[in-house]
């Protein structure tokens, strides 16, 4: 029923990665499951990370938090991004923590009935995204929110170069430490270390680490983590081409001799971008070049040895790492997996076997039909 293209998410490996990272940082773990757990499926990944010992889950927006609440998750949830002050009643009702990031937001928040709202103060130490830039602004926000009977649950910042620039990371940390130590109040949650910083940056100001991409075994520094996600497709047709035959839109590939070309059901509508032309995939012991332009729904590969229809093709995984694919595309692993669309089925391995196989588009179609 599904197109034969799927992302495989190994929840066992995600659990083991989190346990290992918790041992490294020796602090509370905030599992960052933004953007549907980076496209891997927040509902299932949440279950795995909580069983492995995560004490809090962080998401990007209110709708992401409500998805987890509506699925029955009662654990601590933190929204890292901006929220509307008008949504405060929803945040309080569902016990969802939010980020206070500007004086303007605080003024709007205290005009609401924000008693009992769980708040984390965001300190902008150099990312220049959201957050308070001065200690005076930070204290003013704290005083106003505390006076409004908000629960001042946490304070945090975000490193912009933890994977590449230790000097800038040290500078950001110094600013954050100064901000934290300027309070006589003890925040229950103090966090600054992201995935890469957790693996190498030792500090004693924070009491929690935010783990995101490293859950999936992707880390600049910690090479012992297990890659937990892979992408596969299947051969749907094999063609024997002759010299001079062309392949794909624009006829950008011409066969030089008799060649074997196979078609896979994956294209740029699945998030497999056109820049993949010329890269290689792995099929039945051979690396096969992607030839011709990547189409919306399909792509063609050149085979040295013929394979049967339904042969599984690895886009990234054991033989082609996600990091290698990202390097070849001049991007980052985050972007590749977040771009994988809802057309791509998610297959979940847990307790060493396939536990779930989901395609949200088909499930929505079935639900709509049932409602009629």
Protein language model features and the residues they cover:
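Active-site anion/phosphate-binding pocket segments in diverse small-molecule metabolic enzymes
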Residues: 2-11, 15, 64, 83-85, ...
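Conserved PLP-enzyme active-site core in the AAT-like
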Residues: 24
């Amino acid at each position: 029923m599904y197109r034969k293209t799927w992302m495989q998410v190994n929840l066992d490996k995600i659990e083991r990665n989190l346990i290992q990272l918790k041992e490294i940082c020796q602090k509370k773990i905030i599992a960052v499951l933004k953007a549907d757990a980076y496209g891997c499926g927040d509902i299932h990944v949440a279950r795995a990370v909580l069983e492995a010992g995560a004490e809090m889950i962080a998401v990007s927006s209110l709708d992401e938090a409500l998805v987890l609440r509506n699925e029955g998750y009662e654990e601590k949830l933190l929204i890292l991004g901006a929220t509307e002050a008008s949504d405060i009643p929803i945040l309080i009702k569902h016990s969802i923590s939010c980020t206070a990031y500007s004086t303007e937001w605080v003024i709007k928040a205290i005009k609401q009935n924000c008693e009992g709202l769980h708040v984390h103060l965001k300190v902008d130490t150099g990312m220049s995204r959201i957050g308070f830039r001065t200690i005076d602004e930070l204290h003013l926000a704290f005083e106003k929110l505390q006076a409004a009977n908000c629960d001042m649950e946490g304070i945090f910042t975000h490193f912009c170069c933890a994977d590449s620039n230790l000097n800038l990371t040290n500078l950001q940390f110094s600013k954050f430490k100064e901000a934290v130590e300027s309070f006589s109040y003890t925040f229950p949650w103090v966090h600054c270390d992201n995935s890469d910083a957790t693996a190498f940056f030792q500090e004693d100001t924070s009491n929690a680490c935010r783990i995101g991409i490293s859950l999936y075994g992707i880390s600049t520094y910690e090479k012992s983590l297990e890659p937990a996600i892979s992408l596969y497709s299947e051969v749907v047709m094999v063609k024997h081409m002759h010299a001079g035959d062309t392949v794909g839109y624009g006829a950008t590939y011409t066969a030089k001799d008799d060649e074997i070309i196979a078609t896979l059901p994956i294209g740029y509508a699945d998030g497999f971008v056109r820049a993949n032309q010329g890269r290689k995939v792995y099929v039945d012991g051979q690396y096969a070049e992607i030839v011709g332009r990547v189409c919306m729904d399909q792509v063609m590969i050149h085979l040295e040895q013929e394979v049967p229809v339904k042969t599984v093709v690895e886009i990234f995984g054991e033989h082609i790492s996600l990091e290698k694919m990202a390097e070849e595309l001049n991007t980052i692993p985050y972007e590749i997996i977040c771009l994988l669309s809802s057309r791509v089925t998610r297959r979940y391995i847990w307790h060493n076997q396939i536990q779930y196989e989901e395609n949200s588009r088909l499930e929505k179609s079935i639900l709509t039909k049932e409602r009629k």
